[in-house]
Amino acid sequence: MAKDTPNGAATRGRFITFEGGEGAGKSTQIKLLAERLNAGRIRCVLTREPGGSPGAEIIRHMILSGIGSLIGGTEAETLLFAAARDDHVHTVIEPALAQGSWVLCDRFTDSTRAYQGQMGAVAPALLNAMQRVTIGDLKPDLTIILDVPVEIGVKRARLRRGAAEPDRFEAESLEFHRKLREAYRQIAADEPQRCVLIDANAKVKPVAAKVWAAVQKRLLYSKVSAVQHA
C-alpha cells in the first residue's frame, strides 16, 4: 500500500516505462514486475501506449491499423500519438501517481522518439513541442529498455500473433527494425541516469531477475527493506 504523508496525502507513486522493439517481451516483464511489487504491498497500475485510456484506445486502433498514416503522413500521425498521450497522461497516469500507485507503462515518449523521430523523419522541434504540450514536466523515474536481436524479436512477434494480421509496425522491414533497435540503444546511452538497457535475448525468468535488480537499485532498495521489516 502507498504510505501517507503527515498531512494525510498519499506519497506520490513511481513511474516506470518499458521500451524496446517488437517481440522484446515488454508486456510479459511488466506483468512479472507488477507481481513482485504487489507482493511487497505496492499498488500498481499497468497501462500502455498508444492507448491506456478509452479515448487513447480509439486512437491506438487508428494508428496500428494504418488509418492514421493515410490522413496526412508521418507528421499527422505524430499528432495522433500526441492526442492519445495527452488523454492517457491526464486521465490515467497522473491521477494514479498522485494517489500513490506505481505506474508501469508499456511504451512512452521514447517510442515516439524512436519510431516517429528516427524512422519517420519527423522534425525534432515538432516532437519536442508535442512533448511539452502533452506531458509537461512528467518524466519516468526509470525506463527499462529491453534489447533483443531483430530476427529473434520479429520471430517472437510472429509467434505471438499467430494467424492474426501484423499491425503496421510489425509489418515493417527488417532494416526498419534494425534502425529502431539502434535508436533505442542510443537513447539508453544518452540517458544512463534514467534508462537501463537489459539483454532480453534469454528466458523470461533471467530477464525478469535483471529487471527486478534494476528496480531495486534505482528505486526500491530502501522501500523494500522497510516493507520486509514492517
Curated annotation (Swiss-Prot):
GO biological process: dTDP biosynthetic process; dTTP biosynthetic process; dUDP biosynthetic process
Catalytic reaction equation(s): dTMP + ATP = dTDP + ADP
Pfam families: Thymidylate_kin
The UniProt record lists the keyword Transferase: yes
This protein's GO CC annotations: cytosol
EC nos: 2.7.4.9
Domain of life the protein comes from: Bacteria
PROSITE patterns: THYMIDYLATE_KINASE
Residue positions binding ATP: G20, G21, E22, G23, A24, G25, K26, S27
Database matches in InterPro entries: P-loop_NTPase, Thymidylate_kin-like_dom, Thymidylate_kin_CS, Thymidylate_kinase
Stretches that traverse the bilayer: none
Coiled coil stretches, renumbered: none
Molecular function per GO: ATP binding; dTMP kinase activity
SUPFAM superfamilies recorded: P-loop containing nucleoside triphosphate hydrolases
Keywords: ATP-binding, Kinase, Nucleotide biosynthesis, Nucleotide-binding, Transferase
PANTHER family for this protein: THYMIDYLATE KINASE, UMP-CMP KINASE 2, MITOCHONDRIAL
Similarity remark: Belongs to the thymidylate kinase family.
NCBIfam families for the chain: DTMP_kinase (TIGR00041)
Role: Phosphorylation of dTMP to form dTDP in both de novo and salvage pathways of dTTP synthesis.
Descriptive protein name: Thymidylate kinase
